[in-house]
Amino acid sequence: MELFAALNLEPIFQLTFVALIMLAGPFVIFLLAFRGGDL
């Protein structure tokens, strides 16, 4: 458990969250365009 505590999880979670947002943005735009472009 000490090794797990040594890994600082907060920046890892933040990087994962930012990566999800960066991937979700274009995905939502692509999905809207694919469904006909109407919001």
Swiss-Prot record:
One of its GO terms (cellular component) is plasma membrane-derived thylakoid membrane. The keyword Thylakoid applies. It is a single-pass membrane protein. It holds the Pfam family PSII_Ycf12. GO terms for biological process: photosynthesis. Keywords: Membrane, Photosynthesis, Photosystem II, Thylakoid, Transmembrane, Transmembrane helix. It is found in: Cellular thylakoid membrane. The chain crosses the membrane at residues 12-32. Its main location: membrane. It comes from the Bacteria. The keyword Transmembrane helix applies. InterPro entries: PSII_Ycf12_core-subunit. Belongs to the Psb30/Ycf12 family. PSII is composed of 1 copy each of membrane proteins PsbA, PsbB, PsbC, PsbD, PsbE, PsbF, PsbH, PsbI, PsbJ, PsbK, PsbL, PsbM, PsbT, PsbX, PsbY, PsbZ, Psb30/Ycf12, peripheral proteins PsbO, CyanoQ (PsbQ), PsbU, PsbV and a large number of cofactors. It forms dimeric complexes. NCBIfam families: PRK13686.1. A core subunit of photosystem II (PSII), probably helps stabilize the reaction center. This is Photosystem II reaction center protein Psb30. It comes from Microcystis aeruginosa (strain NIES-843 / IAM M-2473).
